[in-house]
């Protein structure tokens, strides 16, 4: 078992020239154990982070969704974060900049 890789991610999305939001993505605790990867957040992902991703999506595509669909999108975003993190660690590209560069492309 290797030591946990613990990183604090801070990011700032600039959504077109009229919207700018700053938020902390929280501490992501990544445990590498042999060939198995287990991802766990030290605390629940902050609501501001999720809302910012939603806002970026809404502004980009000019879409509005009923409140009932927000839980579905939260799960999708969480799964996306896990997949992106897994891919970056597999490629040994673990810098914060590269992590969010890939993440923003998917959003």
Swiss-Prot record:
<protein>
    <recommendedName>
        <fullName>Putative uncharacterized membrane protein YER067C-A</fullName>
    </recommendedName>
</protein>
<dbReference type="GO" id="GO:0016020">
    <property type="term" value="C:membrane"/>
</dbReference>
<keyword id="KW-1133">Transmembrane helix</keyword>
<feature type="transmembrane region" description="Helical">
    <location>
        <begin position="37"/>
        <end position="59"/>
    </location>
</feature>
<keyword id="KW-0812">Transmembrane</keyword>
<keyword id="KW-0472">Membrane</keyword>
């Amino acid at each position: 078992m290797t030591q946990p890789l613990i990183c604090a991610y801070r990011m700032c999305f600039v959504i077109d020239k009229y919207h700018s939001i700053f938020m902390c993505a929280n501490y992501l605790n990544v445990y590498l154990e042999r060939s198995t990867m287990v991802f766990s957040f030290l605390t629940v992902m902050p609501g501001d982070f999720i809302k910012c991703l939603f806002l970026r999506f809404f502004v980009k595509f000019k879409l509005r969704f009923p409140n009932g669909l927000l839980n579905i999108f939260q799960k999708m975003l969480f799964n996306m974060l896990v997949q992106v993190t897994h891919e970056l660690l597999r490629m040994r590209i673990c810098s914060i900049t590269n992590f969010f560069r890939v993440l923003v492309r998917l959003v």
